[in-house]
Amino acid sequence: VKIALENVHKSYGARAIVSRVSLSVAQGEIVGLLGPNGAGKTTTFYIATGLEKPNQGSVWLNDQDITLLPIHRRARLGIGYLAQEPSVFRHLTVRENLLLVMEQTEVPRREWNSRIDFLLQEFRLEKVAHTLGIQVSGGERRRTELARALAIGREGPKFLLLDEPFAGVDPIAISEIQQIVARLRDRQIGILITDHNVRETLAITDRAYIMRDGQILASGSSEELYSNPLVRQYYLGDNFQL
């Protein structure tokens, strides 16, 4: 199973933001979408989530055209999305945040508590289960949001699209999130990450796409991109180290 963008184009008036971009994410792999500011990566990412619609091109889930499906319809097909902005309910506890999502799913009520207990343990949130969202740390908030994304649907998502998952958290929390994302890949969840923390993202991706001026400049493994002279010239710079 894979998500694929095929020759997507997005313009605002006469200005092309994304031009004929194609990329794919399969289950069980972590894919990065990176590039300098203004490269079009955020718009491309939003086209993948359903927050933006392309002027041309298409988005596919296997052989199903999902180009025009809004984000909530894609969620029902197993495509989860983690926004950059904090999305925990600040005046609910961590457990209540998970319960609220569980109530919207097809999971039988009798299974709610066991599913929530599993997610709390999986994301190391047991100690803050009864803490209000407004009181948790940045790393705990991010882990709560990831756990909540996995609570959607009876079987959980097939794909997770992560927008700046490393933003606003300290180095220890970044390491924890990297480990969690790697475990999700091991569970055959396909993950697309866009983030300004380049080194932290390339450390866990199986492959990545680098964008420049609305197009794909290069793609490949972290090592391939690191040694690509165009990527170093336009994005990483000469002093970048993996």
What is the role of each PLM region?
Residues 13, 31, 69, 92-111, ...:
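ABC-type ATPase nucleotide-binding domains, specifically the catalytic core motifs of the NBD
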Residues 132-140:
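Conserved ABC ATPase signature
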